[in-house]
Amino acid sequence: MRTSLAVIMTAIALLVSACSNVPDSGPVQQLDLDAPDAQEEVIPYNPGAPRAGASPGEIVDGFLDAMKATPMSTAYARRYLTKDAAMNWAPAGRTLVYGELGSHGASSPRVSVELEDAGWLDERGVWRGGLAASQAILDFELIRTEGEWRISSAPDALVIEEDWFLTHFARSNLYYVEPTGHTLVPEPIFAPKGKSYATTLVSSLLSGPGEERKGVIRSALPSGADEPRSVAVRDGIAEVDLAGDLRDHGSEELQLMAAQLAWTLRQDASVDRIRLTIDGEPVVLPGYGDSFNVDSGGGYDPNGTSARVDLFALRGGALVTSSGENGDPWVPVLGEWAESHGVTDVAVDAAGSTAAAITSDRTGVIVGGLASDGRLGTAPVTGTRLLRPSWDLTGRLWLVDKDSTGARVMYVDGDRQVRVAIPGVTGENVTRFLVSRDGTRFVAVIGGESSDRIVVSRLRATSKGEITTATSAVLLPHPDAATMQVTDIAWTSPTTIVAVQQIGSTALFQTVSLDGAPSAERYTLSDRVTGVVGSPVASARLYATSGWNLLDPLDRFDLQLPSDLSDVTYQG
């Protein structure tokens, strides 16, 4: 699949249900095309009507072209259908995105069209991967009506060409709540640009996280609110009217609901504040009044409330820190970490208050605070070959240990060690792993004989933060999947990582989206790279480690390191 297509393949079918509510179209019926479904601020495109005397192949081509209508509307496409087919065609259930149209096959009155470089999304807009060869062939039945060919049977899908998506859809996030209610969790989608953007975001948010995410995330929005009654943006205020019942919502749930809306709607640059009503009645939120700012809810930040972008490293076995700017010195941290302890692979929590490191023989873990009175202790873990640890915002320290049977996944919470079985990860040859700060995503690199794989699993927890189970690991697509040898991985956002591989004297960086939609963001460095240092915090630079240098592959920024420095990392 071409990477340009892959970038936008998570586009949502949310608009389709709105687009479907248009006048029925028959062969000679006059349609009202002056009330488009989405007022997009782009050059309008009004596809032409079926040409008199058009062949079956030309009718199918016109039908597919009509789905490029701008502003978005399915009314144009329905003109190519018979009256009955136009009434029954239900494209909202599936969205197909294709790179190019392949060959036509015609055996009157049927036309088959092959979609090349195609992928699909389900009715919720969830990326489901590429289409199998058999699924990429669309069959259309045609009949003559009043002497003209019209489509009598068409696939129930919105079939969209990739360039149209590149212009009209933007990657966005919906924000839900992890089970403890302390942190928001972003779920990536693509939403149509333009005046309907806020409505689409709220509609998507109200659709909920889905049954497959039960135990991973939840929503604090009121039950019964499957669709917004209305979303109107006036003078920077988004007036959101929902259906539903708030009688079971205490102060904490109301705050979470406001945070979900604020974080989701702040992506719309036209929205500054939100005014919420339920069935037309104003909702007064504790501490906010009858409206609240889109910058509200900072306490639920997926990256943590005290997240910094300082760098940490080991220097002679002692922990040091620096802002990472040119000329800024590396200084020892406070407490016992300022002394040498013969450790490797250090990890600092998101608050910058506690660190953990693997012992030099990789069988144990040292943990301790970074305050002046910080003391070091040993985590309740005895391993064989422990990998670099990872923290989440709850204070869980995640570990992977490897022995002859493969990988074991566990976390340390206080004085407890808890094992977590992750199908597709446990027992495999894990070489690198990451856990998202919100504690809902586990990413691993699994080494193979000819190539490595990158997989992601979602972690399920109780309301008290106990991890219960994990979903089966899902393979994440990569353009070099057949030959990829991953040197390292790191966060670039709460929903994306970067994977680096060394190809000769060139380091190749590939962004990987954790929703499974491939990404086209790809860049290189003409250096030998041994690791990558990244953070989900937007203001953090991405660094590659090369000798005694940190190299920014995006800005070509070069930070020289002291020769006795190792294990450079961000916190979190």
Give the ranges of each region predicted by the language model.
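Positively charged n-region of N-terminal signal peptides that target proteins for export
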Residues: 1-4
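Bimodal "functional hotspot" detector
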Residues: 6-8, 13, 17-572
